[in-house]
């Protein structure tokens, strides 16, 4: 059996990044050398100082985008499966609410509505989680240790849980304010949803329809 040819998509992306960054760095060095000279006219010095500032911002953005791409690629499959699971739970919760609304008591209806809201927040959390960060799972495969062996491990678990609660609280407010930048119903119907910004980092994202596509786009970055 012939050996499969490894994909060069990742390396090609890295090559483009390295090439673009190298050009920007060269321009920065050239301008810095020019500005070190004593005989540069004032107007030319001002123009080049402005250009230097703009180039440094461009380089910083490019470096951040590259870092974000690497993190997003690492966790996009986890996010995909968690999105599917969250949507499945939401479908079940809405179906249960419909059934209870027809035959149940008021307290049962109220409880079912709370479950639906909880599931909607889960869906929004997965979709809007900042791609520049290590993804914090809603449904981890293993239970966290109750008694971590080291102080560092304990602090790490506490930090992760604190960040999860912080992000989920922000998503909860968006859901309650009906301010989500996408339609949950569209996701439930298997439609592609274009999210221009996540709720924290401002990075552009494209969220694929979970029922129809498995590969999530990674070219949403600034």
From Swiss-Prot:
Keyword tags: Coiled coil, Nucleus, rRNA processing
Annotated region (Disordered), positions in chain: 140-166, 199-222
A biological process from GO: maturation of SSU-rRNA from tricistronic rRNA transcript (SSU-rRNA, 5.8S rRNA, LSU-rRNA)
Major localization listed first in the record, in broad terms: nucleus
Recorded coiled-coil stretches: 47-108, 149-180
Domain of life: Eukaryota
Subcellular location per the Swiss-Prot or TrEMBL entry: Nucleus, Nucleolus
Cited Pfam families: Efg1
InterPro entries the UniProt entry points to: Efg1, EFG1_rRNA-proc
Bias (Basic and acidic residues) ranges: 143-164, 199-215
This protein's GO CC annotations: nucleolus; preribosome, small subunit precursor
Purpose: Involved in rRNA processing.
Family: Belongs to the EFG1 family.
Entry protein name: rRNA-processing protein EFG1
Gene encoding the protein: EFG1
């Amino acid at each position: 059996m012939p050996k499969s040819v490894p994909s060069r998509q990742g390396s090609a992306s890295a090559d483009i990044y390295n090439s673009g960054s190298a050009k920007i760095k060269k321009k920065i060095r050239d301008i810095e050398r020019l500005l070190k000279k004593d005989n540069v006219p004032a107007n030319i010095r001002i123009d080049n100082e402005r250009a230097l500032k703009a180039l440094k911002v461009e380089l910083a953005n490019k470096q951040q985008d590259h870092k974000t791409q690497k993190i997003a690629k690492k966790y996009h499959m986890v996010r995909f499966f968690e999105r599917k699971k969250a949507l499945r739970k939401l479908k079940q919760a809405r179906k249960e609410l419909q059934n209870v609304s027809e035959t149940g008591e008021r307290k049962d209806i109220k409880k079912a509505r709370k479950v639906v809201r909880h599931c909607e927040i889960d869906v929004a959390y997965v979709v809007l989680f900042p791609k520049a960060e290590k993804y914090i799972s809603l449904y981890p495969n293993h239970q966290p240790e109750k008694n971590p062996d080291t102080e560092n491990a304990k602090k790490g678990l506490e930090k992760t849980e604190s960040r999860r609660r912080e992000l989920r609280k922000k998503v909860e407010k968006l859901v309650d304010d009906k301010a989500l930048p996408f339609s949950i119903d569209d996701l439930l119907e298997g439609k592609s949803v274009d999210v221009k910004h996540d709720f924290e980092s401002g990075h552009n994202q494209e969220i694929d329809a979970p029922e129809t596509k498995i590969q999530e786009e990674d070219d949403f970055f600034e």
